[in-house]
């Protein structure tokens, strides 16, 4: 099967066996988020440039060989992760299952607060779920990414927090009105 290839500026991390493509403008904190996730036991596939290959209906990412296993942290420099954390914190390629786009938080910027419908982003003809996360000083973007992955996995099992609250509200309204909500 022919591979369709492209590349993007970002980082690819495996979180709970789920490939997370971190996107956002230069300097937003993608590499710092990746470092936080690595320190929590997750695995780096690529930092800075992510090569993307389509294999059937799946996407697989990797780093260009020259920068494979490196993480660039402003103020520290280039970190070669196998030397610092051991070979278990890196992988030469991994799946891309979820896109987390980091955007600067500021007054007036709106973020999804219900999560009923997941936005999508296309890469190499494959539609991926997209979560837009606020990156702000002293914020824990890594925690938001982990929560996004857990939510993604829960959605794959057929349930969302929005559906739970909707069911609870419908039940409450039915109880108060004496009949089911239509």
Regions from the PLM with identified roles:
Residues 11, 35-36, 143, 147:
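Solvent-exposed alpha-helical segments within well-ordered globular domains of core cellular machineries
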Residues 1-17:
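P-loop NTPase nucleotide-binding/switch module
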Residues 97-182:
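Conserved NTP phosphate-binding and transfer environment spanning the P-loop NTPase/kinase superfamily
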Residues 7, 92-94, 125:
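A short, structural micro-pattern
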Residues 9-12, 49, 118:
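Short, acidic/polar N-cap/turn motifs at the starts of alpha helices
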Residues 43-101:
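Conserved nucleotide-sensing/catalytic segment adjacent to the nucleotide-binding pocket
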Residues 16, 53-58, 103, 124-126:
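Short acidic-glycine loop/turn motifs at beta-strand connectors
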Residues 16-44:
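Glycine-rich phosphate-binding P-loop
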């Amino acid at each position: 099967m022919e591979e369709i290839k492209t590349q993007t500026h970002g980082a690819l991390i495996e979180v709970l066996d789920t490939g997370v493509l971190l996107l956002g403008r230069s300097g937003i904190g993608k590499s710092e988020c990746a470092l936080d996730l690595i320190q929590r036991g997750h695995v780096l596939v690529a930092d800075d440039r992510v090569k993307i290959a389509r294999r059937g209906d799946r996407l697989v990412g990797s780093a260009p060989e020259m920068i494979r296993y490196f993480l660039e942290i402003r103020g520290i420099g280039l970190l070669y992760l196998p030397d610092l954390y051991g070979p278990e914190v890196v992988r030469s390629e991994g799946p891309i299952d979820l896109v987390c786009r980091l955007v600067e938080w500021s007054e007036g910027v709106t973020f999804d607060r219900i999560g009923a419908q997941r936005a999508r982003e296309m890469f190499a003809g494959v539609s991926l779920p997209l979560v837009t996360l606020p990156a702000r000083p002293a914020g824990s973007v890594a925690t938001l990414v982990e929560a996004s992955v857990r939510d993604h996995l829960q959605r794959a099992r057929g349930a969302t927090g929005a559906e739970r609250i909707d069911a609870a509200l419908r039940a409450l309204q039915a109880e108060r009105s004496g009949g089911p909500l239509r």
